[in-house]
Amino acid sequence: MRGVRWAGIIAAGEGSRLRKGYPGLPKPLVPVAGRPLVHWVASSLRAAGVRHLWVLLNSRGDAVRSALRRSAEGMRVRFLRRDTASSWESFRLVSRALAGEAPRFLVSTVDAIVPPADARRFAAESGARWGAAGGGRGPAAALGLTRFVDDEKPLWADLDASGRVRGLGEDAVRKRAVTCGLYALSAGAAAKLPGARRHGRLRDFWIDLVRSGAAVRGVMLSKTVDVDRPEDIPAAERVIRCFDA
């Protein structure tokens, strides 16, 4: 698929593990390689072709607005403001806003450092149709995956030969890749999202979606980093130094 022009950033989390190193600073504004964390996420989405961006902030995230507007040149940026109860509720809220405008869209967590080249490839491959063996249809959703694992609680994923996700979490057997905080969803799939209280975590939604038999594509990316802890920042900065090198 080419030309994904809509995306969302989930930037409403508390960032509790980063707080000890950056007290009083909202997670999206934590500096990484001299720029706010949210800058790198927005820049990679822009490189993927995104021109319309929805950003979810919590009630303490107002300072993020001006920082993001400076980093999102060429994109129309709109904000949602909500103190959500879970990562699932946040994803659902952003997805439903996007589904009213776009046939397919990307969603990223604010802590996902993904090289621009990988973001472009994810946008291109996340909606590509399967061959005749797969019925010639496109996936309902897609997950960005990486083999770089440096997370306390990684969500493992198993793929078949066609790139379809066959198992997540405890259902994964081979455990050769993990999710990285970058997602794609069709408007049709977004219209069928369960209620905000159905899941306590975003990963629970994805596990259930794969178990239901829905066509979910896994797109293998290079080295990506989730910035959850102060000790993740050096790894993220090493990845950033290689952006489009």
Residue ranges and their predicted role:
Residues 123, 127, 131, 164-245:
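Catalytic-core segments of class I nucleotidyltransferases/pyrophosphorylases
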Residues 1-23:
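N-terminal nucleotide-binding beta1-loop-alpha1 segment
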Residues 35-52, 66:
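A short, N-terminal amphipathic alpha-helix
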Residues 5, 51, 103:
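Short acidic/polar active-site loop segments enriched in Thr and Asp
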